[in-house]
């Protein structure tokens, strides 16, 4: 609630040159115009599946269409450096990596694949979801020519950046 007000306040702080947020995107379409008007520069959108039923299960009831509609609205409003963050999980979304990569063909966005990591002792059993970044790249390269990109100064973090030959957008790969 009132995030637009908070963003305006943060944007008015002397020296703030970049303002970005990460969202699950569920309500993004409803707020994206106000976010843009409040001075937000960049958006990172967490999206771990492009399959309706998997998405609903992962998010415990979220609707994929709501997030995808929000992404399109973000692009229509001219946000730059929009990123889709995908946590890569073996047996859950590993059959969707190429479909995610294809989102960059006609959209100026960056799809980032992030290696799955167990966060505590209780999650060690879920290490079976881990997929090495090299395997993710291999899956995408089977049907696409990937071109290494120079890393931009702003907002690149630890990602290795690639582009499918001829694509508008980019692919980022973040190792755990």
Q: Model-found features: residue ranges?
A:
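Radical SAM/AdoMet-radical enzyme domain recognition
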Residues: 2-112
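A short, surface-exposed helix-loop junction/capping segment
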Residues: 115-120
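Alpha-helix initiation and capping sites
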Residues: 94, 105, 113, 130-134, ...
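Beta-strand scaffold of nucleotide-dependent catalytic cores
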Residues: 112-114, 174
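Accessory C-terminal segments flanking Radical SAM cores
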Residues: 121-176
């Amino acid at each position: 609630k009132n995030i637009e007000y908070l963003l305006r306040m943060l944007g008015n702080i002397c020296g703030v040159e970049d303002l970005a947020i990460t969202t699950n995107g569920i309500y993004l379409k409803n707020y994206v115009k106000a976010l843009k008007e409040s001075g937000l520069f960049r958006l990172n959108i967490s999206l771990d599946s492009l399959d309706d039923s998997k998405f609903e299960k992962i998010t415990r009831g979220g609707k994929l269409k709501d997030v995808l509609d929000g992404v399109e609205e973000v692009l229509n409003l001219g946000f730059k450096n929009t990123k889709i963050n995908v946590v890569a999980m073996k047996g859950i979304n590993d059959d969707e990596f190429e479909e995610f990569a294809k989102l960059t063909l006609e959209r100026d966005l960056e799809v980032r694949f992030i290696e799955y990591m167990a966060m505590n002792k209780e999650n060690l059993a879920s290490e079976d979801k881990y997929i090495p970044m090299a395997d993710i790249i291999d899956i995408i390269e089977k049907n696409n020519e990937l071109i290494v990109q120079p890393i931009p100064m702003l907002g690149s973090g630890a990602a290795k950046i690639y582009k499918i030959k001829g694509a508008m957008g980019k692919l980022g790969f973040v190792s755990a």
